[in-house]
């Protein structure tokens, strides 16, 4: 199975600019690019911060932009999102029994679990006992290898201002996955606006640049210095799944540099 991973689209009302770039246009360009170059992808996943201010019109535009995608689209909220407005504009989105936007899908041989770390009014992530109980049940009810999708990382990534707004009170999350770590084959994040890959307690993780603006790589500034922004080029990921391999390619979809044959 092949799917596309996008994150942090940050659409705004009226389709204007944000930090000197146009998030709505950037998303349209991403969609057009992967529809042309990856037509055999079977799904699109967007890991949160779908909009920047949570405006109804921004979700309306998101729905319109994604309407041309001829494959299933799976969304989760980020800290910039409003869960209630997502449900208004995407009424078929699945939720757990407590109203959190959490659900599972079969991705080929894998169980894909989509998690909700949104907490209204704050930038950091929250994963409460209700969400933890739901996650643990999904893990217990399946024997498949697992892909986790969530907006906030649950460990530090070294950019201190971003770490300050990652998942807080990680115990409920870690309790939920305890004993299932060996089945978690890949964790996909948003929130960071940087291409990062590695592993945490032997669980591989991956995140990438957003489609509008990025976070600069500064591993020295203190947390209270503010999040350092940059207008680096946006990306999407092409993820290829088999039982033997999880392969992730990163596409700089606005790159227009010439292609040429490498000889000798």
Predicted regions located by residue number:
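Active-site-proximal beta-strand elements of phosphoester/diester hydrolases
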Residues: 1-13, 109-119, 147-149, 203-209, ...
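N-terminal active-site segment of His-dependent metallophosphoesterases
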Residues: 1-61, 65, 141, 157
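Active-site environment of divalent metal-dependent phosphoester hydrolases
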Residues: 12-15, 52-57, 79-86, 120-123, ...
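Short glycine-enriched, charge-decorated loop/helix-capping segments at active-site entrances
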Residues: 16-22, 91-92, 121, 159-166, ...
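His/acidic metal-ligating clusters that form di-metal
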Residues: 30-43, 124-206, 238, 246
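Extended active-site neighborhood of metal-dependent phosphoesterases/phosphodiesterases
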Residues: 56-136, 169-184, 198-201, 209, ...
């Amino acid at each position: 199975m092949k799917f596309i991973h996008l994150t942090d689209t940050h659409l705004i009302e009226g389709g204007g600019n944000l930090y000197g770039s146009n998030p709505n246009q950037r998303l349209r360009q991403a969609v057009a690019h992967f529809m042309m170059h990856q037509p055999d992808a079977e799904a699109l996943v967007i890991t949160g911060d779908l909009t920047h201010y949570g405006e109804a019109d921004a979700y309306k535009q998101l729905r319109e932009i994604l309407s041309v995608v001829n494959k299933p689209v799976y969304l989760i909220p980020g800290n910039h999102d409003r869960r209630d407005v997502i449900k208004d504009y995407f009424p078929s989105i699945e939720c757990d029994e407590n109203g959190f936007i959490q659900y599972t899908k079969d991705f080929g041989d894998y169980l894909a679990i989509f998690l909700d770390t949104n907490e209204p009014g704050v930038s950091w992530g929250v994963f409460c006992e209700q969400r933890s109980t739901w996650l643990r049940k999904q893990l217990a009810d399946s024997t498949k290898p697992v892909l986790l999708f969530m907006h906030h990382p649950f460990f530090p990534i070294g950019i201190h201002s971003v770490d300050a707004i990652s998942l807080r009170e990680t115990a409920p999350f870690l309790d939920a996955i305890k004993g299932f770590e060996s089945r978690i084959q890949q964790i996909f994040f948003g929130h960071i606006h940087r291409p990062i890959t590695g592993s945490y307690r032997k669980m591989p993780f991956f995140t990438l640049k957003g489609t509008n603006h990025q976070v600069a790589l500064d591993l020295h500034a203190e947390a209270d210095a503010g999040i350092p922004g940059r207008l680096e080029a946006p990306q999407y990921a092409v993820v290829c799944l088999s039982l033997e391999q999880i392969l992730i390619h990163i596409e700089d979809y606005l790159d227009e540099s010439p292609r040429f044959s490498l000889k000798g």
